[in-house]
Amino acid sequence: MSANYWASTQCNNWLLDRPQLELARKEDLRYATRLECAALGVFFSNLLSLICKRLNLRQRVTASANVFFRRFFAKNSYSALDPFLVCATCVYVAAKVEESPIHIKSAVAEATRSFTEHGFRGMPTDHSSLAEMEFYLLEEMEFDMVLFHSYRSLIVMFEDYGSGSAVGSGNSIHERSAGAAGSGSGSGGSGMMIGLGIEAAAFGVTKGLASVEEGDAASAIAEEDKVQLNEFNDEVLLMCWFILNDTYKTDIPLMYPPYMVALASIWLGLSLHPPSFDKITASLHTMQTRRDEHHLSIQRILDNPASTPAELASAKREPSPPSQDALTFFASLNVSLPLLAEIVQEMVSAYSVQHQVQRLVSDGPGIVKLLERMRESRRVALIKDRDQTRTHA
């Protein structure tokens, strides 16, 4: 185990690129379309969330189960194995890894119930099948079970740089959630924020206890350039949390470091939050106007034959950007901005794909028939290849 993300197996062994993930789907694409393969990933992500919710497991377990499932199928095809059995096994293993163990009978019973509701009745009722699959799952993941999730980095950055940070208000998300936990708050924005605070604490983010990876997330801004992100308020934090939830329906957690995914969620959250987006747009327009005026004043000096070097020197300095501004915040990041833009684009593209596969995902029996068709096509192809091999021999 490691509290250092940079020394972890997740960083060194399990950051996959797009060609590696495409290679994993190569066999499936012989028997299904690319959109159908994407629908399978979203469908089983939804199933994992449903089973974890019914078993009263924490969000951390749900996130880990999703990562385990996608890691497994980054090495295997949907058509060669039973994704339903793998799905149930991922929940069972993730609960143990995240120190929220459940009995194997509960895992099998709840998985069987959820699968039946979605049209699949082939889940083995004996516990030995799930126990056996557990060993296959661990072996395929090379026993690398320690995970770093983006939620922790998001909370650390909110407390350090958000409008609700200790710098800004003196109250952390943990203090606010703890103080209001027994207040019986009703519905609405504050109630949702309290719920998020409790969920964050339950997720494992404890005040004053941060891993090295979380420290790196907080120090992504150069020490001399640290600013407070006023637009990063409670509403934006909630939106970022939901965005991170949605990333687990994609391969993003397998492709990028957690703190970069958290930063990308902040950018997307600010863009989707109308007041924050309007403020960013206004700031961009103001700065562009000031720069244009500055360049115009320099041009006037250069065009004036009577101007002196002292006048030019006094006008050379560019106007400084506002310190408490989202654009200034992201410009001061000590990270790769092209990589950040790439992750944001992946998130946007993922929402487009999820919208396209919505009809397929909502049809549980249709997904079951799709898998049966893929397996049958694979079986026929294997028999055909075997017969051809014998003929040539």
From Swiss-Prot:
Q: Do the record's keywords include Oxidoreductase?
A: no
Q: Where in the cell is it found?
A: Nucleus
InterPro entries, per database record: Cyclin-like_dom, Cyclin-like_sf, Cyclin/Ssn8, Cyclin_N
According to the entry, every stretch annotated as the Cyclin N-terminal domain falls at: 51-146
Highest taxon above the source species:
Eukaryota
Q: Name one GO cellular component term.
A: mediator complex
**Keywords in alphabetical order:** Activator, Cyclin, Nucleus, Repressor, Transcription, Transcription regulation
Which GO terms of the molecular function aspect are on file?
A: cyclin-dependent protein serine/threonine kinase regulator activity
Subunit architecture: Component of the SRB8-11 complex, a regulatory module of the Mediator complex.
> Would you tell me the protein name for this molecule?
RNA polymerase II holoenzyme cyclin-like subunit
Please name the source species.
Mycosarcoma maydis
Q: Taxonomic lineage of this organism?
A: Eukaryota, Fungi, Dikarya, Basidiomycota, Ustilaginomycotina
Which gene underlies this protein? Answer: SSN8
